[in-house]
Design a protein with these regions (language model features):
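ATP-dependent helicase/translocase motor core
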Residues: 2-324, 333-348, 371-374, 380, ...
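Conserved nucleotide-binding/hydrolysis micro-motifs of P-loop NTPases
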Residues: 168-170, 203-206, 332-334, 381-383, ...
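Conserved RecA-like helicase motor-core motifs
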Residues: 346-361
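Conserved motor-coupling elements within RecA-like helicase/translocase cores
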Residues: 362-374
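Conserved RecA-like ASCE ATPase "motif II neighborhood" in helicase/translocase motors
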Residues: 374-399, 406-413
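Post-DEXD/H (motif II) to motif III coupling segment of the RecA-like Helicase ATP-binding lobe
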Residues: 409-461
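Conserved coupling/interface region of RecA-like P-loop/ASCE motor cores
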Residues: 453-475
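Conserved small/polar residues in nucleotide/adenosyl-binding loops
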Residues: 476-481
Length: 481
C-alpha cells in the first residue's frame, strides 16, 4: 500500500488537518521534501537539529526587542547548552524552567554597570504572539541512528509536542513500546525540550510526560466537566492543543516532583486541569463571593494533593500581589504529607516545609500577621477565639483539606473571625451530606465535581468490591465440641 493511503497516514492527516484548520497551527509535511539551510523548509542546517533556530530567534526579537545581536547569541547559547553528564530528565527540567521563566542575559546599563534581565521565550499572556508549527514526517538523526517522527509540535521553534500515531487496528501501547522508547535511546535530543507526549491510533489517545511508564499515560476525554467524554485523538487535540490551553498547561500544570529520591515529571490530568481552572475562576471573582469560593469534590485517589499544588502554583504566578496561601488539615500526618508535597514540587523554593508549619495557635497568628507565601496548619490551631481579626494588605487564600469533617465547626468559626477577608476553598474526596450546613456556610457549594463513578470510568481510581463470604461449618462438628 502506498504511503498516501496507509491507515496510519490517514490518522496523521486527520490530526494535521485539525491542528491547521481548527486550532490554527501552521502544518508542514517534511516527508522527502525538506530542504536544509537557513532559507530551507524549516531553517535547519542538519537533520540532527531539533530546535528550529530561525523561528526561535525571530520570537526572541519579537518578545524582547531590546536584545542586541550579541545578547541574542548569548540567549540562544544558554538555552541550547547542557552538561554532558546530565540525564535526559535533568536536561528537560533545566530547559523547562528557562522556557517558562525566561533566560537570563547580561545587560549593560548607561552608567556602565551590568544587570541581569530575563529574555522571554514564549508570550504566555498573548497566545497569538507565538508561532505554532506542527511538522509531519520530520527526519531526525543522531550520530548512529536515523528516525522519522509522525508529528512534532513547535512553539517559537521549540519542540514541545511529540505525537506518535498508529493505525486504528493497532493497540496504542505499541506506539510506546515500538517507537517512543526507541526514540528515547536513538534520538534523545528530541526530548530535551519536550512538554507533552501523545500516543494514539485515532480511536484512542493517551498523553504523558518524559519518564512516565505507559500505565501513567492518561486520556483527555473532556473539554468541560459536563461532557460525557471521548477517548478519541480529536478530543485530546482539541483539549490540549488549542493555543491558549496549550500554553496554560505548559506554564501552570507541569511539576517536577523530587520525592522518593528521584525526579518525576507530572502533567495535570484532564479532571485536575478543568477543576483547578474552575477554582482559579472562582478566585478571580472572589470579591463577589463573600470569601466562599466553593467545594472542590474530587473522589479519593484522583490526585487531590497535586490539584492543590497546581492551584497554588497558578494563582501565585498569575495574580498580582501573590496571596498568602494557607493549607488546612486536621491531622499531623496529613499536614506533613501535604507540606512535603508542596516542598518536593518546588513551590516553597529552597526553604524546608517545616519553616511554614504553624507549631501552635500563637505561632499561627504570628505567621499570619506577617506576609508569608505559605502557611501549613491544623485547623485545631485556630484556638484563640478572642484574638483580634487580621486585615492584611494582601490577599489570603485558604485551601482546606477534607473540609467536610465535623470537627471543623468551632475552629472554622474561629478561622473566619481571625481572617475575615480571606477566600476559602474546601477540598474533599467524599460528597457532602445533605444536612452539612457548616461546610456550606464556610466554603459555599460545589465548584468542581469529579465523582467516584466518573473516576472509575476514566481509570483515575479503581473500584473496591466487597464480597460477603463465610466458611461453612457442619452442625455435627459443632455438637462434637
Amino acid at each position: 500500500m502506498s504511503r498516501e493511503y496507509s491507515e496510519n497516514v490517514l490518522v496523521q492527516n486527520s490530526a494535521g488537518n485539525l491542528l491547521q484548520n481548527v486550532l490554527g497551527w501552521e502544518v508542514v509535511l517534511a516527508y522527502n521534501s525538506e530542504k536544509l539551510g537557513p532559507d530551507g523548509t524549516l531553517g535547519r542546517t542538519s537533520y540532527g537539529e531539533v530546535l528550529l533556530t530561525r523561528y526561535f530567534r525571530q520570537a526572541l526579537l519579537r518578545l524582547n526587542p531590546w536584545l542586541t545581536p550579541n545578547q541574542l547569541d548569548e540567549v540562544q547559547k544558554k538555552f541550547t547548552a547542557h552538561v554532558s553528564t546530565a540525564s535526559l530528565m535533568q536536561i528537560n527540567e533545566e530547559k523547562y524552567f528557562l522556557l517558562r521563566d525566561g533566560i537570563p542575559v547580561t545587560v549593560k546599563r548607561p552608567d556602565g554597570r551590568t544587570e541581569i534581565r530575563s529574555a522571554a521565550v514564549i508570550d504566555f499572556k498573548n497566545p497569538e504572539n507565538n508561532h505554532f508549527l506542527a511538522v509531519k514526517e520530520m527526519k531526525i538523526h543522531s550520530q548512529l541512528y536515523r528516525r522519522r517522527t509522525d508529528i512534532v509540535g513547535f512553539v517559537n521553534g521549540i519542540p514541545l509536542l511529540f505525537i506518535e500515531l498508529k493505525k486504528p487496528t493497532v493497540d496504542v501501547q505499541n506506539a510506546y513500546i515500538d517507537n517512543y522508547r526507541d526514540y528515547l535511546d536513538t534520538i534523545p535530543q528530541l526530548f530535551y525540550y519536550n512538554a507533552f507526549l501523545m500516543l494514539s491510533n485515532g480511536l484512542e489517545a493517551k498523553v504523558g510526560t518524559l519518564g512516565s511508564k505507559y500505565e501513567f499515560f492518561h486520556e483527555w476525554k473532556r473539554l468541560k466537566e459536563s461532557d460525557a467524554g471521548s477517548v478519541e485523538l480529536e478530543t485530546m487535540l482539541r483539549g490540549i492543543c488549542e493555543k491558549k490551553t496549550f500554553l496554560d498547561l505548559l506554564e501552570n500544570f507541569i511539576l517536577y516532583d523530587y520525592s522518593g529520591g528521584c525526579t518525576t515529571k507530572i502533567l495535570a490530568r484532564n479532571h485536575q486541569y478543568l477543576g483547578v481552572n474552575e477554582a482559579v475562576s472562582a478566585y478571580e471573582n472572589r470579591k463577589l463571593k463573600d470569601g466562599r469560593l466553593g467545594v472542590f469534590w474530587h473522589t479519593q485517589g484522583s490526585g487531590k494533593s497535586y490539584s492543590m499544588v497546581f492551584l497554588a502554583q497558578k494563582i501565585r504566578r498569575k495574580f498580582v500581589g501573590s496571596p498568602t496561601i494557607v493549607v488546612l488539615t486536621d491531622r499531623d500526618e496529613l499536614n506533613r504529607q501535604i507540606s512535603d508535597t508542596f516542598e518536593n514540587c518546588g513551590l516553597l523554593g529552597k526553604t524546608k516545609a517545616s519553616q511554614f508549619i504553624a507549631s501552635s495557635g500563637t505561632d499561627l497568628v504570628k505567621k499570619l500577621r506577617g506576609n508569608p507565601s505559605f502557611v501549613f496548619t491544623l485547623i485545631q490551631k485556630f484556638n484563640l477565639p478572642k484574638e483580634p481579626p487580621i486585615y492584611p494588605d494582601h490577599d489570603i487564600l485558604i485551601l482546606s483539606d477534607e473540609a467536610h469533617r465535623s470537627q471543623y465547626g468551632i475552629f472554622a468559626d474561629n478561622m473566619m473571625h481571625l481572617l475575615p477577608t480571606a477566600s476559602r476553598i474546601g477540598f474533599t474526596g467524599t460528597p457532602l451530606l445533605a444536612d452539612d450546613h457548616i461546610t456550606e456556610r464556610t466554603f459555599g457549594g460545589y465548584l468542581s465535581v469529579y465523582d467516584f463513578k466518573r473516576a472509575v470510568e476514566d481509570g483515575a481510581t479503581v473500584p473496591l468490591y466487597y464480597e460477603n463470604r463465610a466458611d461453612t461449618v457442619s452442625y455435627t462438628h459443632l455438637r462434637a465440641h
